[in-house]
Amino acid sequence: LHVVLCIDRAGIVGNDGATHHGLFDMAYLRPIPNMSICAPRVAEDLRDMMTLAQGLDGPVAIRYPRGRSVLAERHTPVEYGKGICLQEGKDLAVLSIGAIGNTVQTALQSLPNGAEVGHYDMRWLKPMDDSLLHEIGKRYKTLITVEDGEVCGGLGSAVLEWMADHAYTPRVIRLGVQDRFVEHGSTAELNHMLALDAEGIAKTISENCHS
């Protein structure tokens, strides 16, 4: 059945209340056969994904957060099942999906100039970009996955599974919501509490840059 699910209020939604957070959708949609799942980082991605989804077979889920979108300085058109490299690194790479990738970019800008950290916007949780993941698996010793949802079954789990299936052995650190319900609060307060703001992400990167 070809249906396009536009999942609004994905991730932490802030003042809408504790029952409105969209934290579990990636984890429960990923096991469904023939399901495609994507998340835009910037406004242009969302436009491309909605256009692309109309021509796909099977169900497609496009997840995006509450609030205003970010416009891209330079936009790479979205391709089905393909991620992009936003920044190349040396020993450590951050893999993100969706709008939280903009927070990762802010975090990276706060690091010392000598930090050589890669950043990849995966764009698609399912299917995953095999060629990009092979490149990442060969190149990096440490990976940090960042997602605005439950880490159990989400991007972090998917990356761990893929690396194990293809005999790569990087250390994988998963940032996201750790097996819990999240209370009411502003997005800034909650992301800070979960270490998913720029400060928290930068701290995790710094602690693992030379491990």
Go through each PLM region and give its residues.
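Internal gly/pro-rich beta-alpha loop/helix module
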Residues: N15-P33, A39, A43-Q54
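Thiamine diphosphate
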Residues: C6-I7, I12-G22, G55-S211
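A glycine-rich helix N-cap at a beta->alpha junction
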Residues: L1-R9, Y28
